[in-house]
A protein has these predicted regions:
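Catalytic cores of nucleotide-sugar-dependent glycosyltransferases that transfer UDP/GDP/TDP-activated
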Residues: 1-264
Length: 264
């Protein structure tokens, strides 16, 4: 109710993973009409360069801003001045939330974590050598070349404004130091709880359920029945054509398609 009174649209529930943590879903759409004022404020406070950002920048930035507003509201309504609050922001897409809290609620400790860098993804995704030639890349020139000036600006600004700056590996730490001009404070490796993967007893049931869903999707896309014993191959993940191996996957599918000995 308090959030709604403040113009924040949220849904609260439980995340269906181990521990069932509380999750707040944030609707950023109410801030779209205020985007110019929001980005102007960030320029005045941090020199965040949003002027060339398109909607693939605007929407994530507004989501981050909305998340920052929700955190601010939650802290004001649910915590005391004696409590120590930490907010962790992952990737440039949430960086605007960190910047908002730094000015609106500086008592909240802000951690910024990158899993790669904007420029690193661009370089690797365009078949250019990343680590062997990194020292020769000028970040500002790369940002202009790949039209990611605003994304790079938000990532770099968040890294510099964070109370603690982290990344997930030593190799991405070298990216951060060069492209963001900021050494990380800590390397925090990715990790997965054992419960994230099904037990041996559950595996077959989940495999069957997944296959049934695949068949439903295939039939909906093709507009015709698909045989129950059809060979199904799938890929998932962030849409980065080369970085995530989608090009290799398509080439492999092409080779299989030309193989007359498969029997499928």
């Amino acid at each position: 109710q308090r959030a709604a009174q403040e113009g924040l649209r949220i849904k609260v529930g439980r995340w269906n993973v181990a521990g069932k943590p509380i999750v707040i879903l944030v609707d950023f759409s109410t801030f779209i009409t205020q985007k110019d004022e929001i980005f102007a404020s960030f320029w005045e406070k941090y020199k965040l360069d949003s002027i060339s950002g398109q909607w693939d920048y605007i929407e994530p930035a507004l989501f981050g801003y909305a998340a920052g507003k929700v955190i601010e509201s939650f802290v004001r309504f649910n915590s005391s001045i004696r409590q120590r609050i930490i907010a962790q922001f992952h990737e440039w897409m949430t960086g605007a939330g960190l910047l908002y809290l730094k000015s609106a609620m500086p008592q909240v400790g802000c951690v910024f974590t990158t899993h790669a860098t904007v420029l690193g993804r661009c370089v690797a995704g365009n078949n250019l050598p990343l680590y062997s030639e990194m020292k020769n890349y000028v970040p500002e020139e790369l940002a202009r070349r790949f039209n990611v000036i605003s994304k790079q600006s938000l990532e770099k600004t968040a890294a510099h404004q964070a109370d603690c700056f982290t990344t997930v590996s030593e190799i991405t730490a070298t990216e951060c130091a060069h492209f963001l001009d900021k050494e990380v404070d800590l390397v925090t490796p990715n990790g997965f709880e054992n419960v994230f993967t099904p037990s041996e007893a559950e595996w077959e049931g989940k495999r069957k359920a997944g296959r049934e869903k695949f068949l439903q999707v295939a039939q909906a896309i093709l507009g015709r029945p698909v045989a129950e014993d059809a060979l199904i191959l799938g890929i998932s993940g962030r849409y980065e054509f080369k970085n995530k191996g989608i090009d290799v996957f398509i080439d492999a599918m092409g080779q299989l398609n030309r193989n007359n000995g498969l029997g499928k």
